[in-house]
């Protein structure tokens, strides 16, 4: 019996994450981890049983939830947020939360799945970075910085993966 593949989408309750879930569910079961439940009215009834949900806020300290998902072969991280604001007007707690959700949480999740990413067995990983991580953007200084950090992180880890001999890479979307 061939085991059905499974995708984990962090931030898959709406937007691009949910659209990816609806596309992937044609090929494999999908687990969505997000702080809000998906809008199930967007999920066709004939495939609803292939989509499951676990509530999790990326601002939590304990990421052990991700240790439960050792049966996935695809990891997609789309979670993140931005705030249109001049840096001088941004509250410090917003800065901390944005860096935590957009950058630190991604590194922590990648770390939880690094054994699978680093293995010789195919493991598909994609992170929604943003064009803001590639260029300066007034009113998006903190968001851009959080995404630029991801860009450099992914490039660096991909070099490490290549040098280790695995064909797996992290796709910067």
Regions found by a protein language model. Give the residues of each.
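Conserved glycine-rich Rossmann-like NAD(P)H-binding loop of the short-chain dehydrogenase/reductase
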Residues: 27-41
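Active-site loop-to-helix junction immediately N-terminal to the catalytic Tyr of the SDR YXXXK motif
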Residues: 136-144, 156
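Substrate-binding pocket helix/loop in short-chain dehydrogenase/reductase
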Residues: 86-87, 94-97
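Residue(s) in the substrate-gating loop at a strand-loop-helix junction
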Residues: 130
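N-terminal Rossmann NAD(P)H-binding glycine-rich loop of SDR-like oxidoreductase domains
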Residues: 13, 21
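Active-site helix of classical SDR
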Residues: 110, 146
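Conserved NAD(P)H cofactor-binding loop of Rossmann-fold oxidoreductase domains
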Residues: 78-83
């Amino acid at each position: 019996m061939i085991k059905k593949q499974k995708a984990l989408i962090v931030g898959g309750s709406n937007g691009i994450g949910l659209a990816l879930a609806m596309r992937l569910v044609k090929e494999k079961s999908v687990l969505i981890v997000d702080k809000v439940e998906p809008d199930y009215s967007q999920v066709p009834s004939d495939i609803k049983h292939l989509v499951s949900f676990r509530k999790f806020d990326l601002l939590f300290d304990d990421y052990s939830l991700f240790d439960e998902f050792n049966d996935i072969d695809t990891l997609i991280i789309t979670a993140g947020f931005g705030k249109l604001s001049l840096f001088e007007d941004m509250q410090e707690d917003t800065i901390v939360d944005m860096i935590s959700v957009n950058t630190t949480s991604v590194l922590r999740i990648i770390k939880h799945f690094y054994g699978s990413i680093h293995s010789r067995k195919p493991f598909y990983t994609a992170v929604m970075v943003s064009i803001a991580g590639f260029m300066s953007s007034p009113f998006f200084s903190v968001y851009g910085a959080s995404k630029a950090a991801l860009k450099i992180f992914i490039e660096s880890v991909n070099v490490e993966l290549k040098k280790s001999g695995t064909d797996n890479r992290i796709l910067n979307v």
